[in-house]
Amino acid sequence: MTDLVKLTIAQSHKLLKDHKISSAELTKAHLERIEKLEPEIKAFMTVCPETALSQAEAADKAIKQGDIRPLTGIPMALKDVLCTKGIRTTCSSKMLENFVPPYNAHVVDKLAKEGAVLLGKTNMDEFAMGSSTENSAYFTTRNPWNTDKVPGGSSGGSAACVAASEAVFSLGSDTGGSIRQPASFCSVTGYKPSYGMVSRYGLVAFASSLDQIGPFTKDAMDCALVMNAIAGFDDRDSTSVPQTVPDFSSGLDGNIKGFKLGVPKEYFSQNMRPDITEKINDALGVLSGLGASIDREVSLPHTPYALAVYYILAPSEASANLSRYDGVKYGYSYNPTENMWEAMEKTRAKGFGPEVKRRIMIGTYALSAGYYDAWYVKAQKVRTLISQEFNNAFEKYDALITPTTPNLPFSIGEKLNDPFEMYMCDTCTIPINIAGLPAVSIPAGFVDGLPVGLQIIGKPFADQTTMRIAHAFQCATAWHKETPRL
Ligand SMILES: NC(=O)C[C@H](N)C(=O)O
């Protein structure tokens, strides 16, 4: 008997199409798994079984009539930063505890049109600020590989639920690593598309020039199938790029012979664990065995500045974006007060957690008159230098290969009181957002029973190339097939 929760999208699709299983069965199997594991994993903010079962029923009806697309009837989860009409969307913040959006995010509509089934909304660091889900105002998600460890963040719930086989796939958002870092920590495939490839309409904004939505899946093929469904122009997002969506799954043939891959040395910094470097070296050996050429002498000298640039630009944008939470328009409101200003202050003081407040203060400072040129403008200039450096490298290479993270999943509480240590988790992922590039993290082995991720970075809008390399690697390895014992 097939273990329904272990199936990929592609495998489930085949069984659904051949009428060997129904979406209702598949959905029920996942809902049961959620019920069994959630007390331990805590990946979900909200589970919506009624919605899931009625969507599964609709999918089964469509399939009976021969109307089946790659995601029809497939149970999925969405990070709680994506607006879902009629379903609470909290961003794991007290500020939006009871916020029920009156509309769907663009990607949510797209997935609904495909017939995907929504199991629920996943836990995250508050407003996507963090690398461990410990900044959730509600609870910390556990890493399915070792429940004393964090699952990464900010999309920790979305990564954990796929790793724990509670959902076939999920969506997250990535501003500085929030998809790739938890994908690495949980040993799943996590994809950040090129900036502009997926509409941000209905994604609660953190840092708009960096945010992108992307999938968590069990392998690169599934990732391509989800990208096919969510990518594409949308005039409601002014940064959405008007170009035809490629077929992300075409070219996934396992062949990367002749591909030129560069390995930038700055990504193997002082804070990198040597046993992670070893795993990455093994992975490079696999890629070279597949016929790709590997150049380890690549240098991107501005890399060390990326973290500083990010922690000026992202908080600046956040301070502007989060000004909307004033207790008047929507969300939490504290109002037993004397006047409007006091109400606003108290709303924000009580509604936001410490990390969100820290970022708002950093951003407000960086944007304030007198400091704007010294911090914000300077960071923008360095951002351009970082982008140019990548563009130069891509004249020689088809893709760049790095570790996804400098560290292994760490213990719950370990970095919570040291924000800088937490920020350092993203040294390998942040430069990619700064330059708007596509990048994927794929499972590359284990150290002390904990997952290591490999990052493949592509040229702007060469998303298919990154996926092709990821797929080829997965044809030659089995790391992505390993699942935690739960
Ligand atoms: N949002 C992200 O992509 C994660 C990053 N760790 C941050 O805290 O900003």
Swiss-Prot record:
The source's domain of life comes to Bacteria
Which organism was this protein described from? Dehalococcoides mccartyi (strain ATCC BAA-2100 / JCM 16839 / KCTC 5957 / BAV1)
* Descriptive protein name: Glutamyl-tRNA(Gln) amidotransferase subunit A
Quaternary structure (record)? Heterotrimer of A, B and C subunits.
In alphabetical order, the GO MF annotations are:
ATP binding; glutaminyl-tRNA synthase (glutamine-hydrolyzing) activity
Q: Which residues form a coiled coil?
A: none
- Keyword Disulfide bond among UniProt keywords: no
Keyword set includes Nucleotide-binding: yes
Describe its function: Allows the formation of correctly charged Gln-tRNA(Gln) through the transamidation of misacylated Glu-tRNA(Gln) in organisms which lack glutaminyl-tRNA synthetase. The reaction takes place in the presence of glutamine and ATP through an activated gamma-phospho-Glu-tRNA(Gln).
EC number(s) recorded for this UniProt protein? 6.3.5.7
Q: Which family does it belong to?
A: Belongs to the amidase family. GatA subfamily.
Catalysed reactions, semicolon-separated: L-glutamyl-tRNA(Gln) + L-glutamine + ATP + H2O = L-glutaminyl-tRNA(Gln) + L-glutamate + ADP + phosphate + H(+)
Alphabetical GO CC annotations of the entry are: glutamyl-tRNA(Gln) amidotransferase complex
Q: Which InterPro entries match?
A: Amidase, Amidase_CS, Amidase_dom, AS_sf, GatA
| Active site location | K79 (charge relay system), S154 (charge relay system), S178 (acyl-ester intermediate)
Q: Which GO terms describe its biological process?
A: translation
Corresponding gene?
gatA
Keywords of this entry: ATP-binding, Ligase, Nucleotide-binding, Protein biosynthesis
